Design a protein with these regions (language model features):
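Conserved catalytic or regulatory cores that recognize and/or transform ribose-phosphate-containing ligands
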Residues: 1-201
Length: 201
């Protein structure tokens, strides 16, 4: 999955460069690797509790599918976007405009994607990319700006209440989610019904 590989590569580069100099560490979390199975709850509720609630930001990537519905939203990805917005956390949404095979085109899914874009177009939270290179550039630029802004805000908060000392240089871990709804729907599984989701912590 190229976009996931790109995000991992960008995060590694950030951690090795500005992350190292700024004492910030970005950690990626992926639902299939980082969510522990639980009984008695809906799959999306488990995702939200174990990963979403602990994350500082989310990256959501849409191909030509919007994902599988949850109890409350049209897809798990959309639920996570809405919950993060409600909490005032950072949301990055990317739509792939890369070429796809005709056999992969689903007009019903495409209609849902367009409706989603229309709903969010005035909220300024999504970007359309046409190639892997463009996606790489967007993610790198957006994450870098986000992290430098977060650090500046942290410094300002400290300076408002205490004198500046070595405490501000303690390593800060940033939780960042990304949710990936690619060019297909996965089969329903016991732990989760959406496409691929990765969290960054």
């Amino acid at each position: 999955k190229t976009e996931i590989e790109i995000i991992n590569r960008v995060v590694d580069n950030i951690n090795d460069s500005i992350g190292f100099s700024m004492n910030i560490f970005v950690k990626t979390l992926y639902w299939s690797k980082n969510v522990m199975p639980e009984a008695g709850e809906y799959p999306q509720s488990i995702i939200n509790k174990q990963i979403l609630d602990k994350s500082d930001a989310i990256i959501a990537i849409f191909g030509n599918r919007i994902g599988s519905p949850t109890q409350h939203y049209e897809s798990g990805t959309i639920e996570e976007i809405e919950l993060m917005i409600q909490k005032g956390k950072q949301v990055f949404v990317y739509f792939s405009d890369k070429p796809v095979r005709k056999s992969e085109i689903d007009m019903e899914a495409e209609t849902k994607i367009q409706a989603f874009k229309e709903k969010y177009k005035d909220r300024g939270i999504y970007v359309v990319y046409a190639s892997d290179e463009e996606f790489n550039d967007y993610v790198s630029m957006h994450l870098t700006r986000y992290l430098t802004t977060e650090l500046a805000n942290e410094v300002n908060r400290v300076n408002e209440h205490t004198r500046f000392d070595d405490s501000i240089s303690q390593r800060k871990e940033v939780d960042l989610i990304y949710d990936y709804t690619k060019f297909y729907d996965i089969k329903q599984v016991s732990s989760y019904t959406d496409s691929n989701i990765m969290k960054i912590r």
